[in-house]
Amino acid sequence: MRVPWRWLQEYVKVELPPEELAERLTMAGLEVTAIERFGIPGAPLEWDRERIVVGQILRVERHPNADRLLLATVDYGRGEPKVVVTGAPNLFPFLGRPLERPLKVAFALEGATLYDGHQPGWVKMTLQGRAIRGIYSDAMVCSEKELGISEDHEGIILLDPEAPVGMPLADYMGDVVLDIDLTPNLAHAFSIIGIAREVAALTGRRLRYPSTAVRALGPAVRRLVGIRIEDPQGCPRYSAMVIHGVQVGPSPYWMQWRLRLCGLRPINNIVDITNYVMLEWGQPLHAFDYDLSLIHISEPTRQ
């Protein structure tokens, strides 16, 4: 069970260092086998607080000398915006168009240490200014690979619109992850809230549950969808809810980041939210296409 520190803090305010909390959890029977850091001191790649910050793309223009390259003008909260050369495919939809929402990015300045996105494995490099097809560029909009988040180098990170321009990326999304080896008798702790409950008991801090209020509208679910359970003993209850007006697309980046920290790969907003709730509450969920109209629960395999 991988527990991101920032996520845990939303439910129980922990003032202990991660190592001390790990010791208390281990002595209570929840063995912490590893502590990982991302972007902060002690991480394999520390994100330089002065040189790796949140930026905002103001406009995207075509590179005058290369069809596959773009020029992105980026405000990074310090002085004049910088124009950088990028070939990020997920920026081409914004080419020459007014930006309908703030386009926030992870922005690295000259001298920053990053991973080389064009090299296999994890090879560090120092960002240096140079001319790219006749345009000088001394900064970079970063992919996940360059920041050591994942192997993904197909496009740059698009942060949430609320990300504060100029904030060090380490302050915005740097994190610590506790890797906890849970035994089958601790099923109550197989979730972020389950771990938060244990932490609250061990530290005497108050546990803050997230709101679960849901207002159901329209006809009863049983009039909209059917559920067939073949093995009532193995699965005595199966609950469903119908959600209309859903469009499949990418999840907000804060959710993608939390899923990655927990060891899951983001897929799309539908799959990601079911995985997110499972991690948060320990309740497995599955999303079905409403066109199926019948949810068929077969007999579980005995393994």
Residue ranges and their predicted role:
Residues 78-80, 237-243, 298:
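Short, basic, glycine/proline-bearing loop/turn elements
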Residues 13, 26, 61-62, 260, ...:
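Signal for well-folded cores of large energy- and translation-related assemblies
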Residues 1-219:
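Phosphate-backbone binding interfaces of nucleic-acid-interacting proteins
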Residues 2-7, 187-201, 263-289:
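Conserved phosphate/anionic-ligand binding catalytic regions in large, soluble enzymes, centered on
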Residues 293-303:
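Residue-level detector of conserved catalytic or cofactor/ligand-binding positions
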Residues 249-252, 256-270, 274-275, 298:
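TRNA-recognition modules of translation machinery and tRNA-sensing kinases, especially anticodon-binding
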Residues 47-49, 125, 281-292:
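Glycine-rich loop at the start of a catalytic domain that most often binds anionic cofactors/ligands
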Residues 166-182, 222-261:
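Residues forming anionic-ligand binding surfaces in small-molecule and nucleic-acid pockets
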